[in-house]
Amino acid sequence: MEKFELIAPCHFGLEAVMKREILDLGYEITAVEDGKVTFEGDAEAIAYANVFLRTTERILLKVGQFRAETFEELFEKTRALPWERYIPKDGKFWVTKANSVKSRLFSPSDIQSIMKKAMVERLKTVYHIQWFEETGSSFPIRVSILKDVVTVGLDTSGVSLHKRGYRKLTAKAPITETLAAALLMLTPWKKDRILVDPFCGSGTFPIEAAMMAAQIAPGMNRSFLAEQWKHLVPRKHWYDVMDDAASRVDLTVETDIQGFDIDGDVIRSARENARLAQVDHLIHFQQRPVSELSHPRKYGFLVTNPPYGERLEEKEALPELYRVLGERFRALDSWSMYLITSYEDAQRYIGKKADKNRKIYNGMLRTYFYQYAGPKPPKKRTGE
């Protein structure tokens, strides 16, 4: 079966999580770089990666990689790529995004235009036609240039994979589903342990945790661009992968996941999002301020995305908010806490230095993932 190189972009700082997910699917990693993991897989792997990977933004099919320091080089080397292997005669194709870092070629619009012309020239020669109707399936191309090395990939996903199909209602400053899933994977939380988000917003952390607990694949309720590419990914692969995903779901799983927020409207949005994700029965949402945070059980997890204070009036309220969060966390003496924030004084007002502090870029925003590890619960005796 034909093999492809596939690229899974991810948040900077979370490449190890992405790598682990891909290995768990059984694919061979060929490269790990800042913000992306490359692996080898067949046509079925394109379907599996899109449906099952929780932490990537999209899956790119690598068309080629080359060095280019001039637009002439870019044109010639783009034209030399085997575009006919991927794009049929009636295909609609364009460079949807180009980014350049530390490279001589830096104008995205020029890069896009020149590469499209080169692709057209190649396909005109191969297909013996002068004009492309482009009435068939879509083939968007994404290009990244780093230190003059051009990487070219076909976007197999279409709409970003963080869009699972359940978030219809959004709270202010939401965390993306892919980032929330990756952060949950950085914690030792398992489905038999308590998880509480005291600033749950539209419910992303609780919903992603519940989907993991119920083994609901993140791409089960959406479509993908490569479903149109029958010559590359036969329809049978998509049916088989979706059947596999459906067979793993366990909606009867027992788990204790809770989400609190001071805003009642936000809680209603979170409940609706959970319903659309088919996990509303697994999560308890409640309107509650962080000052009332408590739980009768031990050895739980707080996983949260507190307010960052992007506006001045919000920033002035942050010291007290983080002080109260730290106070309530200390009252939960056997618990662990994991929070992502861009607020640099978070540890100071929480009143305790984190055991680990990981820098993560949420888009262009530099954030910190503070990790406070609590004690492990005692092991159950045999026969209990």
Predicted regions and their residues:
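Non-catalytic nucleic-acid substrate-recognition regions in nucleic-acid-modifying enzymes
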Residues: E2-S137
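Class I S-adenosyl-L-methionine
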Residues: T96-A98, S144-L186
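A short, flexible beta-alpha/helix-coil linker loop
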Residues: S100-S103, S160, P307-R311
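Conserved S-adenosyl-L-methionine
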Residues: I175-H295, E310-R311, K315-A317
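C-terminal catalytic and target-recognition region of SAM-dependent MTase-like enzymes
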Residues: P289-E384
